[in-house]
Amino acid sequence: MKRLSGRVAVVTGAGSGIGRATSLALAERGCSIAVVDVQPDGAEETADLIRSLGTRASVHVADVRDPKRMGELPSEVEGSLGSCQILVNNAGVTAAGAFADETVEDLRWIVDINVWGVVHGCRAFLPMLQQADEAHIVNMSSMVGLLGLPHNVSYSLTKGAVRAFSEALRAELVATQVGVTVVFPGAIHTNITAGARGGQAARLA
């Protein structure tokens, strides 16, 4: 985007870690931030940090797995901060362990958050983004979305899906004013590891 100052950004998983850091970085550049997180305490803490920078923030407690709840967010954000021009789909979870030991429930859990959470976010906000003079979607993948790792099979699966989804969506929107970026962070110590599943989850801490 040509400018960030005066824009409204929606950041999921903004209550901690990369989501909080991204929110603060955008706020420092003049964006108002809609802080979206399933944990209200973390979301409020992030919002307070943003406001301490002299920037507006609103808090929206939401589970990205829930398409109905995600569908409610655009009108909530617009009512609090105005129409958004930036969407950062950052919310995610991880797992570590042998694929053979993972249950179907484990796989559905990580796919629902890491993949469907991104899809629900894009579906909910794309109509609003398409009305802006310039807009951008940022989807958080991982280095394992480029090169899958053993004992991180389910996580690699989801981040590879985010990569492919983002690249396809970018190509679909290339002639519009909505850009799409997919980000591939390396290993970063955040509290995503606190909720990790799998027999080797402890090694992530």
Q: Predicted segments — roles?
A:
Residues 8, 15-16:
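Conserved glycine-rich cofactor-binding loop
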Residues 40-41, 61-72, 104:
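The beta1-alpha1 cofactor-binding region of Rossmann-like NAD(H)/NADP(H)-dependent oxidoreductases
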Residues 98-99, 103-108:
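Substrate-binding pocket helix/loop in short-chain dehydrogenase/reductase
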Residues 99-100, 147-153:
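Active-site loop immediately N-terminal to the catalytic Tyr-X3-Lys motif
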Residues 122, 158:
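Active-site helix of classical SDR
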Residues 142:
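Residue(s) in the substrate-gating loop at a strand-loop-helix junction
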Residues 174-205:
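SDR active-site lid
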